[in-house]
């Protein structure tokens, strides 16, 4: 699937990589599954770059329009699992 990641050009290269890494974890959550601990680590790094809820919501909406993947729902679901547990949107 081809789509663009929501990137702020004011971010450093490292910050862009960390944001893309988080969205890669969202993709894995929907496509094949991801370990809850790994997903939450990527989300925590994302939050260091995007601490404001309003900006997070805007970025999540942009990503969902591009990819069809709801990052908010993924985060909420993963939060309910233990770190070692493998989580997927596929039931």
UniProtKB/Swiss-Prot annotation:
Similarity comment: Belongs to the UPF0223 family.
InterPro entries tied to this protein: BH2638-like_sf, UPF0223
Descriptive protein name: UPF0223 protein SAR1071
Matches recorded under Pfam families: UPF0223 (PF05256)
